[in-house]
Regions:
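Flavin (primarily FAD) cofactor-binding/catalytic cores of flavoenzymes
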Residues: 1-258
């Protein structure tokens, strides 16, 4: 087993069975290739990323710790699991943080003593058909930090993170946000409550002895950034020096020539 090895190119051998694999640590010849690379291969940064600016911009794939960022505030774009956990960590480290929230599902990390992965399994949600063609991939906001916990955007805001809508434009030192923050939060809440309802029904139907958890349905009051969302932000005036693009990945099989 070799670790830290990047596969650069793989192609079928000429005239005989097998493959020639070029890697960052030399060439390997093998009879079989298993491409278990998953969907998270190539970091994606949208075309709206401002070019040649004074901002420090990185994809979430290249973020490791708060200390790698320059002094100043941070705009985190994307509120899936990566974006939420990065924003949370930065705020805890003393950074002023803005979090751009798009459409998402927000499952409970745990409910009635069971992890959300267990619930997805017993409720058949791993095999569920998509509700809308073209929406096969849904951003999921869930955290594994500090032992794992349910993502609560209102709680993040009450702690000091400013929530904004989907980022539409980033240019000339200004960020423009969509008028969709309230709807995105509402739909995330809806997906959360739907899973709780389905879990409760499953417990009743199967006669399981799992403790009730009524507090899971309690939401904090809406923070000001949600009731009166920003639609435009002057980055310099806000003291923002960094942008983290937590905007997902694309598949990339250009290395595989078979």
């Amino acid at each position: 087993i070799r670790t830290g090895v990047e596969v650069l190119h793989a192609q079928a051998l000429d005239g005989r069975p097998g493959f020639r694999v070029e890697t960052s640590k030399g060439v390997i010849e093998t009879q079989r290739i298993i491409a278990a690379t998953g969907p998270f291969q190539k970091p994606v940064i949208p075309a709206i990323a401002q070019q040649n600016s004074d901002l420090h911009q990185i994809h979430s794939a290249h973020y490791f710790r708060p200390q790698q960022l320059p002094a100043g505030g941070v705009l985190v774009i994307g509120a899936g699991s990566s974006g939420v956990q990065i924003a949370d960590e930065l705020q805890r480290a003393g950074k002023k943080v803005w979090l751009s929230v798009g459409a998402h599902d927000r499952p409970p990390r745990r409910y009635r003593q069971r992890d959300f992965c267990w619930w997805l399994g017993v409720l058949g949600l791993w095999e569920a058909s998509v509700k809308q063609p073209g929406k096969e991939h849904v951003t999921i906001a869930v955290s594994g930090a500090r032992g794992g916990h349910t993502v609560d955007f209102r709680q993040l805001a009450h702690r000091g993170i400013t929530l904004v809508g989907q980022t539409l434009e980033l240019n000339h030192g200004k960020a423009l946000f969509g008028d969709d923050l309230q709807e995105n939060i509402r739909r995330g809440d809806e997906s959360y409550l739907e899973l709780l309802d389905a879990a409760d029904a499953y417990i009743t139907r199967n006669g399981l002895n799992l403790p009730e958890e009524p507090e899971a349905r309690y939401f904090l009051p809406d923070p000001q950034c949600l009731t009166h969302p920003l639609h435009e932000l002057d980055l310099a005036n806000a003291g923002i020096t960094s942008v983290i693009w937590a905007t997902g990945y694309a598949t990339d099989y250009r290395w595989l020539k078979v």
